[in-house]
């Protein structure tokens, strides 16, 4: 049995990435303060449909995701359908795979096209760190349920008497891994120590990311894939990512204190992605349908893979596990790739993965391979800057990576690109695209 992955439908049509779009990414409580993930999702999908000049009724499926769930609208995909003029009967469902969520939604739509169930679909993801579901303590939640069942005044009073003042305080969303209690930043510190990633190297990667992102924006290369967003009260608009340090200097990074291990740590706020708001979307079609409608796709999906490892140690190594699977399924080696886009959740995480890509020992002991995945050529790596600069709205990042690498390959005359990301829960995702 061949290890090659056939990312086609029964007619032999490839899965076309027709176009992609995102909102600008904004730091928490700035330009999108008060704007929900759902509203950003509707905004970007509406604009995607408008720019592609496609009748919304043509969309047969929408798969969309968010990581920070909205209790009021748990099926964000269905709400987007209802808010964007699509046919009321359009199939829509929501997914979540932590920071790889829009990788998952893209694959789900692609697989629907591969099976022949649909010809046209939209995938994507949205997250808000500014509109959060603020919870209550477990004791108060338990009491509120009991209160709903209490019949007499005395029973209700007894419930209130067992609550202390601290039980009434609001509980913000958890930032720690449920299984381990470790935050992502603590995991990044863990990885920096395990793989001997220096503070200087982390600072250098962050500086590189911001510098390249600044150059990319100033060149105009992101204009076609980032929309201008107008949000209430409509007194201003945002048309550019606002986390990028346009005057980044390597000296400024050295002044920052460690953020997660104050005494012995090396991971700082500048070498970590900030809490970010934003949304993204990708229009996918079967190759023949795209051409029949007159589109020139920005790329095609060649292969994809997901992975999972233990969460207790270095759980953000997902790219090192998912990438070799995607490469094998594409019949390729790392050196065959034209460009590599890796999510920079933390500089330490990205550098640890890059280091292990080149490690034969890691390949033998962890992957069961005889040779290393390969050494990453920095002339191919995150050439437009990465998440450290652009920011990271959890569910939107995967679609940003896919769209960005396809458009850059198009500008370079074609080739193949790897997009890969780590995710909470020890998860990893990788997708290889080809561009003509």
From Swiss-Prot:
Its main location: cytoplasm. It catalyses: an acyl-CoA + acetyl-CoA = a 3-oxoacyl-CoA + CoA. GO terms for molecular function: acetyl-CoA C-acyltransferase activity. InterPro entries: 3-ketoacyl-CoA_Thiolase (IPR050521), Ac-CoA_C-AcTrfase_FadI (IPR012806), Thiolase (IPR002155), Thiolase-like (IPR016039), Thiolase_AS (IPR020610), Thiolase_C (IPR020617), Thiolase_CS (IPR020613), Thiolase_N (IPR020616). Its EC number is 2.3.1.16. SUPFAM superfamilies: Thiolase-like (SSF53901). The keyword Kinase does not apply. It is found in: Cytoplasm. It comes from the Bacteria. This is 3-ketoacyl-CoA thiolase. It comes from Shewanella woodyi (strain ATCC 51908 / MS32). The gene is fadI.
């Amino acid at each position: 049995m061949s290890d090659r992955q056939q990312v086609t439908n029964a007619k032999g049509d490839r899965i076309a990435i027709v176009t992609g779009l995102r909102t600008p990414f904004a730091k928490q409580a700035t330009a999108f303060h008060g704007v929900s993930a759902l509203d950003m999702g509707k905004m970007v999908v509406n604009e995607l449909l408008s720019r592609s000049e496609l009748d919304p009724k043509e969309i047969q499926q929408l798969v969309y995701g968010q990581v920070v769930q909205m209790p009021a609208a748990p099926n964000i995909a269905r709400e987007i359908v209802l808010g964007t003029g699509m046919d009321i009967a359009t199939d829509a469902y929501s997914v979540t795979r932590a920071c790889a969520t829009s990788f998952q939604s893209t694959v789900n739509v692609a697989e629907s096209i591969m099976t022949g169930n649909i010809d046209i679909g939209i995938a994507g993801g949205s997250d808000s760190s500014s509109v959060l579901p603020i919870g209550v303590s477990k004791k108060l939640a338990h009491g509120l349920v009991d209160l709903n069942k209490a019949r007499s005044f005395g029973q209700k009073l007894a419930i209130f008497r067992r609550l202390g003042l601290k039980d009434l305080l609001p509980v913000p969303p958890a930032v720690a891994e449920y299984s381990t209690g470790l935050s992502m930043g603590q995991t990044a510190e863990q990885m920096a120590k395990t793989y001997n990633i220096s503070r200087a190297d982390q600072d250098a990667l962050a500086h590189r990311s911001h510098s390249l992102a600044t150059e990319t924006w100033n060149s105009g290369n992101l204009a076609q894939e980032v929309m201008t967003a107008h949000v209430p009260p409509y007194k201003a608009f945002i048309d550019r990512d606002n986390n990028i340090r346009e005057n980044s200097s390597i000296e400024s990074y050295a002044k920052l204190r460690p953020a997660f291990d104050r005494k012995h740590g090396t991971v700082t706020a500048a070498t970590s992605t900030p809490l970010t708001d934003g949304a993204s979307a990708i229009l996918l079609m079967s190759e023949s349908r795209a051409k029949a409608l007159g589109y020139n796709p920005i790329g095609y999906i060649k292969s994809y893979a997901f992975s999972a490892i233990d969460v207790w140690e270095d759980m953000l190594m997902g790219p090192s596990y998912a990438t070799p699977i995607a490469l094998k399924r594409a019949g390729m080696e790392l050196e065959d790739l034209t460009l590599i886009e890796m999510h920079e959740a933390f500089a330490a995480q990205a550098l640890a993965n890059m280091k292990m890509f080149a490690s034969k020992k890691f390949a033998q002991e962890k992957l069961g391979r005889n040779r290393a995945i390969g050494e990453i050529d920095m002339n191919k790596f995150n050439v437009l800057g990465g998440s450290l600069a652009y920011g990271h709205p959890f569910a939107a990042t995967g679609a940003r990576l896919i769209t960005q690498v396809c458009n850059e390959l198009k500008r370079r005359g074609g080739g193949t690109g790897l997009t890969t990301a780590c995710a909470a829960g020890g998860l990893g995702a990788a997708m290889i695209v080809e561009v003509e």
